[in-house]
A protein has these predicted regions:
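N-proximal accessory regions
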Residues: 163-186, 191, 221, 229-232, ...
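Conserved PLP-enzyme active-site core in the AAT-like
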Residues: 1-5, 9-197, 202
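Short phosphate-engaging motifs
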Residues: 144, 188, 233-236, 294, ...
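Residue-level detector of secondary-structure transition/capping positions
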Residues: 64, 189, 245-248, 306
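PLP-dependent enzyme catalytic core of the Aspartate aminotransferase-like
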Residues: 19, 26-28, 35-36, 44-46, ...
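Conserved C-terminal alpha-helix-loop-beta "cap" of PLP-dependent enzymes
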Residues: 200-286, 290
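A short, terminal or domain-edge coil/loop segment
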Residues: 76, 101-106, 151-154, 249-267, ...
Length: 309
């Protein structure tokens, strides 16, 4: 999630003495905002297993100003029942904020499922070319005018005109790019699921995903990202990453170019080992963002890298 978009949308509604209930499976920087920064401002934060509606209900029983979650989560692909969590959050007197980066505006529509605010790192799929940094916040006109507008007007975290223009140009091709990326990601996920050197594949579009049925209800497709464990641990994982030729190593995602990263040592390196373990982020986990290259070329690069010594 874009830090400015994410922190900006929570601060107008969250004040010292109030509570934020969040799923624990978050992008590393967002986890830092929720778990470390908000408490410094006197805001109580509670992290729950986002898949467990009972955990949400228990945490929200004491009231909350904001509920927050990612679905699918980065990088373990946890799917959250957005409609159910929205109902529970509203019952507690709060608003639900959803980070919809992995799903994009095309594959999942949290506002239609009951969320109040949706945030995007526009740097990802919306730009799609790795050219600029930016975030986007979607909400009701009343929320924008009464809560978000004054905060932005007086603190100034606004896009430059040039970056805004780049993102608008990116939106023109978003549907075409995401459709191609999703098809490629699905093909890679199916291929890896049967590979002897892969011990686990996490992709919402696979029937083997533990929340496949929920993903089918909430999302139009499985998305453009695949996460998987390379058998053999960290050393084998790094060998695989270093051997890729067509795919670049980068923390970005949603780009026209296929990208991979090692979450345990990059996006989630700030977390303690036991925290990463609870989120299923092991040393063997790879996050793969499918780009626009030819599907056969990507599969060949992956196969060659897996067989490298």
């Amino acid at each position: 999630m874009c830090g400015r978009a994410g922190s900006g949308n929570k601060k107008p509604r969250s004040r010292a003495g109030q509570r934020v209930v969040s799923s624990r499976a978050l992008f590393g920087s967002c986890h830092y905002i929720v778990a470390d920064l908000l408490p410094r401002w006197g805001i109580e934060t509670v992290l729950v297993d986002g898949r467990d509606l009972g955990a949400w209900e228990e945490a929200l029983a004491g009231g909350a100003a904001v509920g927050f979650c990612e679905s699918p989560s980065n990088p373990a692909m946890e799917i959250i029942d957005l409609a159910a969590v929205a109902r529970l959050t509203h019952r507690a007197g709060g608003i639900l904020v959803v980070d919809n980066v992995f799903a994009t505006p095309l594959l999942q529509k949290p506002l239609a499922l009951g969320a109040d605010v949706v945030v995007y790192s526009a740097t990802k799929h919306i730009d799609g070319q790795g050219r600029c940094l930016g975030g986007a916040i979607l909400a009701s006109e009343k929320f924008i005018e009464d809560d978000l507008g004054p905060f932005y007007r007086h603190t100034g975290p606004s896009l430059s005109p040039f970056n805004a223009w780049l993102l608008l140009k990116g939106l023109e091709t978003l549907a075409l790019r995401v459709e191609r990326q999703c098809c490629t990601a699905a093909a890679i996920a199916h291929y890896l699921e049967g590979h002897p050197k892969i011990s686990r594949v996490l992709y919402p579009g696979l029937p083997s995903h533990p929340q496949y049925d929920l993903a089918q209800r909430q999302m139009k497709q499985g998305g453009s990202l695949v996460c998987f464990d390379v058998a053999g641990g960290k050393e084998a994982c790094f060998r695989f990453l270093d051997a890729l030729q067509l795919v670049d190593i980068s923390n970005n995602l949603g780009d026209s170019k296929s990208l991979v990263t090692h979450p345990a040592t990059t996006t989630h390196s700030r977390l303690k080992p036991e925290e990463r373990a609870a989120l299923q982020i092991g040393d063997e986990l790879v996050r793969f963002s499918a780009g626009l290259e030819g599907e056969a070329d990507l599969l060949a690069d992956i196969e060659r890298a897996l067989n490298s010594e």
